[in-house]
Amino acid sequence: MAAINKTKGSADRIKMKIRKGDTVQVISGKDKGKTGEVLKTLPYENRVLVQGINQRTKHVKPSQEGETGRIETKEFPLHASNVMIYSTKEKVASKVEIFVDKDGSKKRRLKKTGELID
């Protein structure tokens, strides 16, 4: 995949089936098996920010005189292919399918359970 530069428009944003507020499960990497809520999606980078997942410590220098430096722990984005939407009712992760409802609106549902997401 080519480098993505949002300002120059060299690549389009990637269509993502995961949205802010969804509960997801990590399927690969150091946090495999953990679940969390999506705080933010980054469609130009195909990444998601998940609460409590992929936490890293960052050393912050003092910005003003008289202030001390500190160590912050915060979440960093992970690739969208490393997460799957998680059903809290059935306790299972599943792929998402988009279908057109009887009234003509697009809906998302889990392939394994058939549970509607929205």
UniProtKB/Swiss-Prot annotation:
Keywords: Ribonucleoprotein, Ribosomal protein, RNA-binding, rRNA-binding. GO terms for molecular function: rRNA binding; structural constituent of ribosome. The keyword Cell cycle does not apply. It comes from the Bacteria. One of its GO terms (biological process) is translation. The keyword Ribonucleoprotein applies. It holds the Pfam family KOW. PANTHER family: MITOCHONDRIAL RIBOSOMAL PROTEIN L24. One of two assembly initiator proteins, it binds directly to the 5'-end of the 23S rRNA, where it nucleates assembly of the 50S subunit. One of the proteins that surrounds the polypeptide exit tunnel on the outside of the subunit. Part of the 50S ribosomal subunit. Belongs to the universal ribosomal protein uL24 family. This is Large ribosomal subunit protein uL24.
